[in-house]
Amino acid sequence: MNELQSKILALKKERDCLILAHYYQPLDVQDIADAVGDSFALAKRAQSASQSGIIMCGVRFMAESAKILNPGKTVWLPVADAGCPMADTITADDVLALRKQYPEAAVVCYVNSTAAVKAVSDICCTSSSAEKVVRSLPNRQIIFVPDKNLGAYIAKQVPEKEIILYNGCCPIHDAVTGEHAAAARQAHPEARLLVHPECREEVSDAADYVGSTAGILDTARRTPEGSFIIGTENGVTDILRRELPQAHIFPLREDFVCADMKKTKLADVLDCLEGRRTPIELPQKEMDGARASLERMIAVS
């Protein structure tokens, strides 16, 4: 552990702060976190936080969710412009237009979305909870926003529902094609292909396992000397290579990188602790609507 990491660990106790980090964050940032997880795990951990402050090492929608679930706490996002391109593909007005078009449908909103979009949805979901959330709803028609790839995957798992898709996606996952999957299998024929459902349908169909980042990690950890092609952001590849030195871990693409997730540096976390970052603030009405959607997700899951 370096000097900067030691300083952060001392200060977070002094300032009564909980540090959370997503699996896609740089490893040195993960190392100073109190908890590392996928979007669902981080939302649950934020909800149960006892500390007066939360530093969310991730992207903006994650920090917004932490604030929504903890309106009385101070929440920081270390890098203000760490956004999510998928979240930017849809607005609250887009959701309201879909509601008007499909008045009998429930709106399921992937957590990779803004607080404003969550506020006009019925319930949120993560990649690990999406199927359970969709099954929990009495409506036959489900508007699934914004990720068309996750929505298409869930439509296959729950064929009794009519899933209405929105044309949004994660550009990092959507850039991976069936040709990439075939090439990776040819290069590593002994390896199992583990992919995230934000990937295109042609990639998910080619996989041995489809699941959340936590699910991918758990699957690989169960075979510590196995061979795996990792079909999600390379932060997961980095974690597995460090944790499982006897395993053979290959990225599905070498450039499978979310630039926004990699923006966070240790110095940014320190700036939060030393008061040089502006906390997350959201309109009260937006927070109230979004909180209902997030809390329903957590209750169902």
Model-derived regions: residue spans:
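Active-site loop-to-helix "anion-binding N-cap" substructures in soluble metabolic enzymes
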Residues: M1-I230, N234-S301
